[in-house]
């Protein structure tokens, strides 16, 4: 259930004094990140679930990582579009594939940072729709393998390679869009469904 519940217990952590601020909460949790990311968030209200509140803080703290992931995806999409529409010489094709590969490596590094942040912030897996993240992660692995094969074998079917890369990119982009578009209402609804499943079990 995470660090908060292990310290306070399931019932006790739900109620806090209204004087507890976001900064005090972060200090209590033993987590350090830029408080400036949280300026728009007000004090915790009496009766508010501290666990849900802290998870919403984490979403703010990780916004830069998610923006970077989107930027890298756009860079890869631009590269793929050029490959699709231009008649390529072998040299220019290899150059664009290298660009794709570099972008992919950055994308993987950002995902790694994403998971590090989750672990550091003690966010439970169900709160981040792990199946969705795993789906994107799998696509990155497939994409990595496709690019590796192309680099290793210059005579790889270019058309097939383009199709594979485009397909996997579309999956990654869709996953990131779902994360980006998830507003607080959807997030709370998802949490409620998860809690109902837990209670039924």
From Swiss-Prot:
It comes from the Eukaryota. This is Uncharacterized protein T19C3.6. It comes from Caenorhabditis elegans.
């Amino acid at each position: 259930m995470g660090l908060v519940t292990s310290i306070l217990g399931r019932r006790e952590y739900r109620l806090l004094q209204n004087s507890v601020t976001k900064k005090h909460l972060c200090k209590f949790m033993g987590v350090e990140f830029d408080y400036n990311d949280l300026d728009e968030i007000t004090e915790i209200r009496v009766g508010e679930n501290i666990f849900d509140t802290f998870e919403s803080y984490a979403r703010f703290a990780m916004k830069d990582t998610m923006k970077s992931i989107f930027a890298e995806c756009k860079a890869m999409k631009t590269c793929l579009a050029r490959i699709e529409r231009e008649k390529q010489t072998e040299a220019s094709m290899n150059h664009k594939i290298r660009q794709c590969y570099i972008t992919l490596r950055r994308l993987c590094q950002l995902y790694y940072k994403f998971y590090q942040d989750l672990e550091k912030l003690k966010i439970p897996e169900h709160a981040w729709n792990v199946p969705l993240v795993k789906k994107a992660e799998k696509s990155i692995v497939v994409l990595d393998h496709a690019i590796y094969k192309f680099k290793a074998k210059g005579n790889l079917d270019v058309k097939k390679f383009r199709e594979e890369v485009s397909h996997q990119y579309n999956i990654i982009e869709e996953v990131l869009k779902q994360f980006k578009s998830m507003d607080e209402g959807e997030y709370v609804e998802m949490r409620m469904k998860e809690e109902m499943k837990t209670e039924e079990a």
